[in-house]
Structures are given as C-alpha cells and as structure tokens.
Amino acid sequence: MTETIKTDVLIVGAGPCGLFAVFELGLLDIKTHLVDILDKVGGQCAELYPEKPIYDIPGVPMITGHGLTEALMEQIKPFNPTIHLNEMIESVEKIGDPEFRVTTNAGTVFECKVLVVAAGGGSFQPKRPPVPGVEAYEGKSVHYAVRKMEEFRGKDIVIVGGGDSALDWTLNLNPICKSMTLVHRRDDFRGAPHSVEQMRQLVASGKLDLKIGQITELQGEDGQLSGATIKLNGNSIAQIKCDAMLPFFGLTMKLGPVANWGLQLENNLIPVDTGTFETNVPGIFAIGDINTYPGKLKLILSGFHEGALMAQKAVKYVYPDKRVVFQYTTSSTNLQKKLGVN
C-alpha cells in the first residue's frame, strides 16, 4: 500500500512562481512539497527558453531561464522542499475543512491543508509543422525548443516560423551555425520590429537565407535530416541542405486534469481573489499564468507578487490559531536565522 505523504502545502508546478512560493511559505514556517510533470524544475523557463535572455526581473538587468531557475533553487535551499518530477496530479479530493487528498499518475498520495496551483498555462505542447513524416525526426534532428545552443554549433539549420521565437533563435544561433535558412510562408513577420530589422540585416549580409514559402518534404534516414524541399510563393521549388530543423508554430495549451478539480474556470484559466489569490474552493490557490483577474499581466514578477500574498492567507489555514506578525527579511533576526544569514 502506498504511504501517504503529509505536508502543509502541496504546490503543483515547479516553475519560477512555484519555486518562489516555497520561499514565501518557508518564511512562515510552512512545509512544502512540489509536483511537476516535467523532468526538471524551472517550468517554461527551463523547458522552452533555458538560454533565452529575460530582461524584466526587477533588479536583474538580464538573466536566462536556466540562470533564474538556478537562482531560485539556491534561494529556497534553507526550506528544503521535496520535489516530485515526472508526475501529474490526477485527482483532488476534499477530506477536511480545508484538507485535501491528492493523487498523482505515479500513485503518489499527498494529504495537505493547502493546494497551490502554479502550473503555468497548463501543459504546453508544440504545434507540429504540416510536413508529412516530421514525427520520424523529432527529438534527433527536429527540435521544438533549444535547450543547449552548443548542440547546434557547426550545423546546417533551418528555422521555420515568423514569430518572436523563430526570430530570436535565428539571431542567437546564427553566429555559431555552419549555415542557416529561415522559412516563413509570407514576407511579413509577427516578431518585435527590432528583431525583424536584425534578421533582414543578416539576409543582406549573406549570413541568412530567407525563403518565403512552406516546407513540403523532408529528406533523411534513421531520424537524421539531410535536406528539405520548399514550395516557394509563386510555386517554384527550392531544395536546401539541413541537418537540424527548428519549427516554431506556437504552442497548444492543455489545461489537463486541473479542469476536473471543481474549480471555477474562465477561458481555461482560474479566476482568483486578488487580495489572496484563492480560488472559489477554500484552501486552493492559483498563482502565475494559470490564473486570471482584471488587469492580469502574464509576467514572472506578477507571479512572485501573487505568491507573496497567497502565503499570507495560506498560513491561516496551516496555523489557524497562530498570530502571525508581518516581518521584513532586512530587519527580522528571526527570518534571517531561517535563511541562515544570522
């Protein structure tokens, strides 16, 4: 029989918002476990743009998704959270007021007083390009995210798409690849104007081959690409050499089992009280991109703010008889002791 894990708070999602929630809850002596469907912490930052620069974290002019994840992991070390990776929450059962029994697809069972949903936008899956047989190359020479730039050094790369991701990786990978082709169905790009301008400069200097059209066929064997056929606008055909393809057709968001937890939903998002970030179910909170409220901004810094306010309400469920006095880490010797800096 599976042993039940008892914890004060269970956090669903180990992205930046979920990790920072551990910090805010830890300051209040609240023990946490985290569950994430991915095989690593960091959420979208680690999975989709680990080496992409982030410029809007307060006080940090630039940091990568990987760097931010590492910094947050270092920040929460004093609170020693337990993290369960490669697991997805399958069921949530209310067994107290409030108390929940939560079961994962791996059979892990938790009992917690508070449940925090920090699952980003749910489960993100990249959209496949409409090219016959592309799945045979996925994971080996067709990649939907860049996890290590060095893997593309010296390669003949084809990037497909016209949005920010396609343009960003065109600019970032161009200096290290052997050759690069950018394919988009029209000569009109949705990315940031500055990125479009830089891309066109690469084309003008001969460092980037821009093809306006669509890939219709891939060549290769045993999962390794060797070339691609492009039907250009005007119906002429171009053949290119490539050993790596990066399609950026956007992501499909799937809310997954969260939709079956009895939470009020609004366009696949969870409405919350903006003073506490509690959902319509007492004891269940939602922070980060998964929630919605008037004026919502899908920014990491917004999720940090939401986590801080959530913790102030969560502590009342965990310690209902305890008088909690708000303290500052700059002046509280109690908090500094918890952080190991005093």
From Swiss-Prot:
Record: residues binding FAD: C17, D36, Q44, Y49, I89, F124, D289, T330
InterPro entries: FAD/NAD-bd_sf (IPR036188), FAD/NAD-binding_dom (IPR023753), Fd--NADP_Rdtase_type_2 (IPR022890), Ferredoxin-NADP_redctase_2 (IPR050097)
Flavoprotein as UniProt keyword: yes
Keywords carried by this UniProt record: FAD, Flavoprotein, NADP, Oxidoreductase
Enzyme Commission (EC) number: 1.18.1.2
Co-factor(s): FAD
Subunit structure and binding partners: Homodimer.
Annotated family: Belongs to the ferredoxin--NADP reductase type 2 family.
Protein name: Ferredoxin--NADP reductase
Organism of this sequence: Rhodopseudomonas palustris (strain HaA2)
Lineage: Bacteria, Pseudomonadati, Pseudomonadota, Alphaproteobacteria, Hyphomicrobiales
